[in-house]
Amino acid sequence: PAGHPDEDALDIAMSLLNNGNQTGTIDKLVLDGEISDGGAGTITFREQGRLLVNCIPLYDENQRRYASNKSTEKRTLEAIQKIANGEFEEWKINAIKNEMCRRFDLMMEDNESIGNLLMNAFYNEQDLEEVLNYKDKIMAISTEDIKRVAKQYLNDNFIAIHIEQGKESKGEKIEKPGYKPVEPPV
């Protein structure tokens, strides 16, 4: 949830999976051509939060079909497991923290973003001093904190939703309703 002590460390852990610089483990799957696309991030609300990881199976042009959802899920879980096991370099942590601080500085230059920041602080009942000291809070997060939250939250407790394109049923037509259509006035 918003304001949870693990929220920022978890944001960094999720950035180790997917980030704008494409240095995450899911980004590597995309760059290596093992999946078509993928992403990871957090959604935080006042009383609960979610970690979302989405991946699109690789489309094989020659066979004109996608790779199986099972193989895509397996590759994705392996990428997540690397982070959960603490298999990441220290420089990535520092780069992600610096990028988060840079984005905060850019956000503080935009009036609309400042308004959104204040609004979020208000409805999540967060201390404004703590919200404005975001950069100090981010830089204080240690690698051990990130390993701890990654191990705690990136585990086997997940729901996998597989979405596939359905096939049209041939020969079935919808019957017309048994009432007269409404005629528009002229």
Predicted regions and their residues:
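PPIase-associated folding chaperone regions across multiple families
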Residues: 5-12, 30, 142-145
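Short beta-alpha junctions and helix-cap segments that line functional grooves
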Residues: 12, 39-40, 148-149
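His/Glu-based metal-binding/catalytic segments typifying zinc-dependent metallopeptidases
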Residues: 1-22, 43, 54, 182-186
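M16 family metallopeptidases and their MPP-like homologs
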Residues: 1, 27-139, 160-164, 172-173
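Proteolytic maturation boundary segments
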Residues: 22, 27, 129-186
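Generic alpha-helical structural context detector
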Residues: 14-18, 27, 120, 151
